[in-house]
Amino acid sequence: MKKPLEVFSEWALNGKDKGMEKNHANPVEEMLNFITKERNEIGNEFSFLDLGCGNGWVVRKMLKEKLCNKAVGIDGSINMITNAKAFNDNCKYIVGDLEEIELQKKFDVIHSMEVLYYIDEPADLLEKIAKSWLAENGRLIVGIDRYFENQESHSWDNDVGTKMHLKSEHEWVEMFKAAGFKQVSSWRANVNDSWAGTLVISAN
């Protein structure tokens, strides 16, 4: 099997990053609406970090929010970051391994869509986010399409040819709690007759 980074680098070269943007648009929109509503109620400017940002579409979207004063995206694929930087906007992009990179500043909002189950040790990454990356009174929000209750996702590792974790909704939520987050909630976004929905986990 290929490493996830190899897969995503290939996708960036053949244009599949645009397909990811299209396929993830609805659940991400729901997640971002949740974030912006909360930040508008708080009323202060906020910084935003997207983990596994791909071509940067979520980063660009968030920077348009009036209270967002900084938007940063991190991705392990140089090709993805090259695609992101091609837009020549005011967003900042970093090439880096999420499990190894160390950040100098904390962020008020941290978002990630369809990344966590590709990580070798997702529990360690969540602990690092809780202890070192998320600012006080900040918000982490994560979207996961591959989880045990979503039967359609069970074959994805073989379909794509890369390693992926498969955990239940309960196991994911408990992992967030064990990482040190005080409040953890979950729901499914973009549910319809043919799709179990994106598992969304929010924590602070």
Give each language-model segment a name.
Residues 164-179:
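Short alpha-helix
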Residues 1-40, 148-149:
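Conserved class I S-adenosyl-L-methionine
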Residues 137-145:
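Conserved beta-strand signature within the Rossmann-like core of class I S-adenosyl-L-methionine
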